[in-house]
Amino acid sequence: MTEHNVRNFTINFGPEHPSAHGVLRLVLELDGEIVERVDPHIGLLHRGTEKLIETKTYLQAVPYFDRLDYVAPMNQEHAFALAVEKLLGLEIPMRGQLIRVLYSEIGRILSHIMNVTTQAMDVGAMTPPVWGFEEREKLMVFYERACGARMHSAYVRPGGVHQDLPPELVDDIGKWCDPFLTVLDNIEGLLTDNRIYKQRNVDIGVVSLEDAFAWGFTGVMVRGSGAAWDLRRSQPYECYSDLEFDIPVGKNGDCYDRYLIRMQEMRESVKIMKQCVDRLSGKHRIGPVSSLDGKVVPPKRGEMKRSMEALIHHFKLYTEGYHVPAGEVYAAVEAPKGEFGVYVVADGSNKPYRCKIRAPGYAHLQAMDFLCKGHQLADVTAVLGSLDIVFGEVDR
């Protein structure tokens, strides 16, 4: 009997694979159907965001953050705004805080619907994306009614938010909440007890709590492994400390637990949105939405027609920008994908000296090899989907 040399073979997954979630290229080493090694090749969407921010004023830097995790844009702007406000020592009025929190939670739902439904599609369920995207469309319209843009909003700015919300919009967001919970029930009815869906997700991509912390996981990836770590609760920012919500936690750390947590988080987000809507249409119905510091926040149009000082301030703020006192600061928010952090170094000028962006997806993607080793080729898409990766923030 002749001897044969058996060797592993290598295949490319992506960068134009339908379930590669953007421009990801994975080099997979396979032993038959079993994955031996996963080598992510990133950088295909690198745009030099951090360097570009150094050449722009603090206000002009805001739109770059929309283009990182472009599924939930306002959450990124929020982190940058918090960092700059810390350096400036600004206080945001309560109405402005509530609007920020409301739209952060809308962003969370936008992201989770996208992830849960497309991950279901990757493992063979075709109906959830159709239902989920109908709801995403309604949320995109809320974005558009707040700031004029469906995606790249540039709405959350250092000092507050760009404009106040009209009362009809706040009411419509309130009316959207309960019917959406019914849609979530319908999606859960399709997936949660579905035999095929469970076979594709239960005990796939298991990560223990120690490993999750060692790899630098945050967000759903840590909560799926059993830690109730959520920055909205553990390091509260804005008015989250005044709001009531629960933090769903898994116990197995597999793809299925992460799916269940995302579903439950959407319900918690609706709970937060309802509280914000109640306050915005009740106790905080009227009030400023931005800081009253005229050296940072531009004046209203009406003021500019009456006051020469307002006109001068407006001109200076939009040409030169405001100067931020020298110092360094790290601000993080609980973005839908995990802890999104911004480390800003200011040198006293009108532009950031350095702006380091800590994207949660970057830490999650580096663990692909660890998570997929020993699984079958078909499980790679299930694991990748449950990591919730968007390439805008990974490549920056």
Swiss-Prot record:
GO molecular function per UniProt: NAD binding; NADH:ubiquinone reductase (non-electrogenic) activity; quinone binding
Membrane topology: Peripheral membrane protein
Source domain of life: Bacteria
Keywords recorded for this protein, A-Z: Cell inner membrane, Cell membrane, Membrane, NAD, Quinone, Translocase, Transport, Ubiquinone
SUPFAM superfamilies tied to this protein: HydB/Nqo4-like
Location in the cell: Cell inner membrane
Catalytic activity, as annotated: a quinone + NADH + 5 H(+)(in) = a quinol + NAD(+) + 4 H(+)(out)
Oligomeric form and interacting partners: NDH-1 is composed of 14 different subunits. Subunits NuoB, C, D, E, F, and G constitute the peripheral sector of the complex.
NCBIfam families for this protein: NuoD, PRK06075.1
HAMAP family in the record: NDH1_NuoD
Family to which the UniProt record says this protein belongs: Belongs to the complex I 49 kDa subunit family.
Function comment: NDH-1 shuttles electrons from NADH, via FMN and iron-sulfur (Fe-S) centers, to quinones in the respiratory chain. The immediate electron acceptor for the enzyme in this species is believed to be ubiquinone. Couples the redox reaction to proton translocation (for every two electrons transferred, four hydrogen ions are translocated across the cytoplasmic membrane), and thus conserves the redox energy in a proton gradient.
Protein name: NADH-quinone oxidoreductase subunit D
High-level lineage: Bacteria, Pseudomonadati, Pseudomonadota, Alphaproteobacteria, Hyphomicrobiales
Gene label: nuoD
